[in-house]
Amino acid sequence: MDIRPSEISKILKEQIKNFDQKAEVSEIGWVLSVGDGIARVYGLDNVQAGEMVSFSNGVRGMALNLEIDNVGVVIFGSDRDIREGDCVKRLGAIVEVPVGPALLGRVVDALGNPIDGKGPLKATEYRRVDVKAPGIIPRQSVHEPMSTGLKAIDALIPIGRGQRELVIGDRQTGKTAILLDAFLNQKPFHEKDAGNEKDKVYCIYVAIGQKRSTVAQFVKVLEERGALEYSIIVAATASDPAPMQFIAPLAGCAMGEYFRDNGQHALIGYDDLSKQAVAYRQMSLLLRRPPGREAYPGDVFYLHSRLLERAAKLNAENGSGSLTALPVIETQANDVSAYIPTNVISITDGQIFLETNLFYQGIRPAVNVGLSVSRVGSAAQIKAMKQVAGSIKGELAQYREMAAFAQFGSDLDASTQRLLNRGARLTELLKQPQFSPLKTEEQVVVIFAGVNGYLDALAVADVGRFEQGLLTLLRSDHSDLLQAIADQKQLTDDIKDKLIVVLNTYAKNFS
């Protein structure tokens, strides 16, 4: 075999030229003990609170407890393949998730990894999950309506863009249904020509500790009704570890803040925060933090307040964007005075209180109008809605008061009887089937008919039929009237006169 020295020297020179001695320095530690989704790690002396770490099998974790001789790490994933003595690396980054329009229409887990089988995300931007809420100066008071399409809510407990409105009630009272209807109600704004960017509301649904079948059902409804294209679903289901359920709302909020900070509008539903509190309690107890009331850690109030304070309406200098939050809390046997419910009630700007017995009476959405409030109030309504909703609030309040007394006496004077009849019909009018949100102008017309006595002569059972017929008539023959209310945002004398003519004719012919 012929060896050519020139060739050998050429190969050696080539290899020397390409030799690049890169040393990777990473700070490491070792697992002392692991179990229940928590690892105790020795080493990692310079790790920061909330920093991501990586175990030797690729699972990520987050350093939460920084003690003198060890670090308490919560594991974002299964702890089955982590052993005592395994190597743990610092990643030098706080927990981040992908954000931006690339996530719309997708289902992701709490760390932003897609779980819907539609391939990888095309997101280019990442954000920290736990950031400080905007201060006082960049904010503006809530003044634009965030319509849910539900008469009972938009008329009596209005929600504004940038508000935090709690949806609270027992299990199976229709809490998720309210979120779903609010999401579906944003569809018309996305159908119009793209010039109307300021009306578009992007929706984020965070499922915490729910059954996978429930989340799949939610996604299916959004998909069938064409609402998935402007929604993001963040799912940390019941089978996910507690740290994932704890971080999911923060991740969803970071995704919503992207829209808020870019001058757009977003609506986020946390379903539900009681399960996040339970997951946080589990983590805290396993990390040996001292328990407080109901064994929750002392900072569970701070956990929820720093999350919900991130929902805000920003002023014009900061782009006029908004993030509206609808946190859900599940109560046990209507006990609103438990620890987590009272905490979240005191943080939010009002609550929608749903009751089991109303639900079983067929009053759906099962909103208890007496206990529900919106602390933003009529600032979050257009003038047309204020004009008709003011009187319905008063009449329903009087009706509730009278109905309690009327149970005892049978001989009621005519005015009381009239009040009870009107109240029963208005209550019937506020009922609404699921998946059928109404536009604001349609709600205005329906409530106008109710408070002006057009329902008084009807049997209670006919109210729903009357409403359906009226809406069908308006949509087909008087769409200009609806459009006028939508454009002028108030009931001018001219619109009122036209409306009364239509209602008189319709009521006369209704049988």
UniProtKB/Swiss-Prot annotation:
Q: Which family does it belong to?
A: Belongs to the ATPase alpha/beta chains family.
**Alphabetical UniProt keywords:** ATP synthesis, ATP-binding, Cell inner membrane, Cell membrane, CF(1), Hydrogen ion transport, Ion transport, Membrane, Nucleotide-binding, Translocase, Transport
Return the EC number: 7.1.2.2
Note the topology in the membrane: Peripheral membrane protein
Binding locations of ATP: G169, D170, R171, Q172, T173, G174, K175, T176
- UniProt cross-references to SUPFAM superfamilies, sorted A to Z: C-terminal domain of alpha and beta subunits of F1 ATP synthase (SSF47917), N-terminal domain of alpha and beta subunits of F1 ATP synthase (SSF50615), P-loop containing nucleoside triphosphate hydrolases (SSF52540)
Outline what the protein does: Produces ATP from ADP in the presence of a proton gradient across the membrane. The alpha chain is a regulatory subunit.
Main localization of the protein described in the UniProt heading = membrane
State the reactions this protein catalyses.
ATP + H2O + 4 H(+)(in) = ADP + phosphate + 5 H(+)(out)
InterPro entries xref list: ATP_synth_asu-like_sf, ATP_synth_asu_C, ATP_synth_asu_C_sf, ATP_synth_F1_a_nt-bd_dom, ATP_synth_F1_asu, ATPase_a/bsu_AS, ATPase_F1/V1/A1_a/bsu_N, ATPase_F1/V1/A1_a/bsu_N_sf
A GO term for molecular function = ATP binding
CDD domains attached to this UniProt entry? ATP-synt_F1_alpha_C, ATP-synt_F1_alpha_N, F1-ATPase_alpha_CD
Q: Listed GO cellular component terms?
A: plasma membrane; proton-transporting ATP synthase complex
Q: Where in the cell is it found?
A: Cell inner membrane
| Organism field | Bartonella henselae (strain ATCC 49882 / DSM 28221 / CCUG 30454 / Houston 1) (Rochalimaea henselae)
Q: What is the name listed in the Swiss-Prot or TrEMBL entry for this protein? A: ATP synthase subunit alpha
PROSITE patterns in UniProt:
ATPASE_ALPHA_BETA (PS00152)
Q: Where is this site: Required for activity?
A: S372
Q: How does it assemble?
A: F-type ATPases have 2 components, CF(1) - the catalytic core - and CF(0) - the membrane proton channel. CF(1) has five subunits: alpha(3), beta(3), gamma(1), delta(1), epsilon(1). CF(0) has three main subunits: a(1), b(2) and c(9-12). The alpha and beta chains form an alternating ring which encloses part of the gamma chain. CF(1) is attached to CF(0) by a central stalk formed by the gamma and epsilon chains, while a peripheral stalk is formed by the delta and b chains.
